[in-house]
Amino acid sequence: EINQLYQELTSVPWDNKYWDTRRQKVLNKRARENLLFLKGVSQEADYPNKKGRIVDINSLSKFDEILTQLFDIINQETDGKAQYLIAEGNRYFKKKMIDSKLKNVKNGIGWHGDAERRKVICLCIGGVQYPMHWQWFYKHKPLNLNPYKVALNSGDVYIMSEEAVGQRWKNSSEYTMRHSAGDVSFTKYKKEWIEHFTN
């Protein structure tokens, strides 16, 4: 089933560009592609007007079926806490066409929290030992040099609570959790963080 789901989700175009609010222009996405999925809603991308693509979940029969099964299981165990969630996809590549040549690329996302959401249910599709890291932070620094690490494979599911997702990660005076994923260039600690523990 997971292979069928992979084929279905990769058959639709994903957002590989975005509107950069700082530079005020459309730029290419380098580390990953994104896509939003909603039931009964579709939208073509219009990057100059800050609009990404939306795919109607009803048009993806296998995705709709698996989401329904997954949410039913989670809702039974959590008294309905998986209701009214939005499906968002992050697509990572090991190789990409750059200047008409297929090249190896580093992909991932650096240490951050998700201020825009309070809970996350993630289904890994097509991943092979894909690294996910979590760490507590206080006053812009990690609490230690040993983040919690998980290697995700296709079919794995993980759930992040409000604390795990790092919804308040910008409040540096509080203990908050951040996460990172992918290549070591994204998950490694900053030089000043390491120096904080070694000096």
Would you name each region that the model predicts?
Residues 1-199:
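Non-heme Fe(II) oxygenase metal-center motifs and adjacent flexible, charged/small-residue loops
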